[in-house]
Amino acid sequence: VMKKTMLRSLCYLLVVVLGLQLVSVWLFSNETEAAAENVQNGIQFKDTSGNIIHAHGGGILKVGSYYYWFGENRNADGTFNAVSCYRSSDLKTWEFRSNVLTKSSAAELNVSNIERPKVIYNSSTNKFVLWMHWENGVDYGQARTAVASSSTVDGTYTYQGSFRPLGYDSRDMTVFNDNGTAYLISATRVNADMNIYKLTPDFLGVDSLVQTLWVGQYREAPAMFKRNGVYFLVTSGATGWDPNQGKYATATSITGTWSGLSNFGDATTYDSQSAYVLPIEGSSSTTYLYMGDRWAGAWSGKVMESRYVWLPLSFPSSTSLSMSWGSNVSLDTSTGTVTASSPAIDTNAYYILENRNGGKALNVLNQGTADGDDLEQYIDSGWYSQQWKFVSAGSGYYKIMNRASGKLIGVESGSTADGAIIEQWADGGWTSQHWQIVDGGAGNFKLKNRATSKIIDISGASKANGGAAIQWTDNGGKNQQWRLLKVE
């Protein structure tokens, strides 16, 4: 009896141990699979409460296992509302923490403009220091830097004031902590030149001017990072809200000789402007993530309607970089692996068709559901009348079906003329309801009709709500290019 009892006990123990091992393996494998997160490019990100993330022109600081994202949170008129802070462990799921600086933090912030906020940590003073560009909210002539500090990364920051560094005007700027020595990089002389300053040991002030780069070349939106002993400085041109060719330079010492400027990305940096470059250090590699803003001002929108563009940088050599487009970015903060890709059309999903020129969504006029209702562009409002499914029509063509009405995009009366109205209609089996998706590069597409060989166009290159959708001969215009944003 004792032997049988002992045998049963041993069998029971073996089952428990094997069960625990299986559970352990299951948990580990699921944890590994869940590590990589997918981010869609060119959209407005949302936090864990479903609110739009307002962190434009900002930067990220990693503290412990969390990434803290600081950025601009503006009023509808573009003036300063707050510097908002979000945190995430995976760069996908963002929790709003607080508005670390607000318009009530100091008198000169009540009516002001605050741009490009960046936070660095001073290990000697145990302070988190926030630098930003300050203007008076009335004109754009003050051109000062401003500073605030806090003893906690996502707590309330105490405003220290604004000033011109060593008397120089300062607009677009960033700060960089080089292993305890910090630098301010800012556009000066009305953006004509780029100055690099060394900060004081407490990071609250400017100690000295290190050097002036690219005199008269009008560079802005600086972002500095260091890779394998080489410093990279990324900038954009100065063309207002409109995107332009991103460029970079390198040096082996911040205070030494910098290279000439070289291009990266395409001619518009994929319709974005640099804000920050984030090193993502993992168990197998370190990836450098370009973080850019797709400013809504380019389509006459409000600043807080702007989108985000994140892409991994590649390094052909120790002193060169490149950046390729991908509509989706896979982020694995555990391994440090970041990849960009552009998946094929998902015929089970719905998409928002966003016009490149107007920044607005293709919509059925008045959210109509009837045959013959015209199509227009309208700011993305979350309506089903702005969501479309691609249904294969064979031979590389698609029917594009509206989510609200179940009807297809077609050309009015099957007309072959330039200017013919684009409408919705029940599926009639006509080739005027068939569309080819033509790659326009950098995540932009043309929608070409099978019957007419013409492109869906927004009439007159309008950027306004209600701009009419028509067909027109392909002329390469941005108003004929569309972004396919998957509804998540």
Functional labels for PLM-detected ranges:
Residues 1-5, 25, 247, 303, ...:
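Composition- and surface-driven signal marking solvent-exposed, interaction-prone regions
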Residues 14, 18-22:
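Hydrophobic core
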Residues 22-36:
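Sec-dependent signal peptide cleavage junction
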Residues 33-347:
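Carbohydrate-active catalytic/glycan-binding domains of CAZyme proteins
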Residues 341-488:
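Lectin-like carbohydrate-binding module/patch detector with strong preference for beta-trefoil
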